C-alpha cells in the first residue's frame, strides 16, 4: 500500500487525528485479515476460518469474546470497556456462492475491525 501526502497530513480535528493514528497502528494486520478472508471465501453460515481470524484479532487486542452467539456457530460478540457509551459494529465476512468476495464483505470485515481497534484504543485512553 502506498501512503499519500493526504493520508499523512495532520487532521484539523484532534480527536479524529487520534483515531486515525490508532487505526494506522493496526492497519497492517487489518489489511492482512481482509486479504486472507478474500483469498479463502466461505459462504454464509460456513465462515469458520473468517470468524476465527476476526475474533482472534480482537481477543488479542483485549476484547472479551463470545463465540457462537444467537445459535450461529460463525457469529461472535466482542466487547471492551464499560459505561453508558456503546458502539456496535457489524463484521461481515461471508462470501457469495461461486463468486467469492465479489460482495466486498472481506472489506467490510477489515473496516469494522479497524474501527473497533481504533475506538478501543481511544477508550483505553479515555478520549472517546
Where is each model-derived feature located?
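Acidic/His- and Gly-rich active-site-bordering loop/insert found
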Residues: 9-124
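N-terminal acidic, proline/glycine-rich, low-complexity intrinsically disordered segments
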Residues: 1-8
